[in-house]
Amino acid sequence: SLEKEATDGKFILPTEAYRGEGLSYYFAEPQDYIKIKNTDKLAEFFKERKLPYVQGRVWTTDSMLRETVNLVRKRKEEGCIAVEMELAGVQAISDFYGFELYDFLVAGDVLIEGNYETDGLSAANHDLDKLFLALQIAKSV
């Protein structure tokens, strides 16, 4: 997460992903952000089930070592609330081939200036509840 107050205890429904990786540029025209197309459908799903969520921009990067103070600050100024490693590329591929992508995230670590919190990483990466939620989403679309 880049905004702990906004994302803590909530699912993150990305609206756009900053393209800080290379894959998406092979499948979509060059631009800084790629729109995440089904975020509003997912928001309706989460709202109907009274699941806590927040919508916002995210930053896709394939290089954790380049999550520098200045780049983190810049992405936050642009409205990014989380950072992840795949979404821009997966959305670009989905758009290219005509697939529907339904993406939600859970913050496991928090990048805040001068600190890096990792307390939630294990649960975010290994909690099976997200798999069951994804299966419910797949059945409902």
Locations of regions flagged by a protein language model:
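Glycine-rich phosphate- or other oxyanion-binding loops that anchor nucleotides, phosphorylated ligands
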Residues: S1-V141
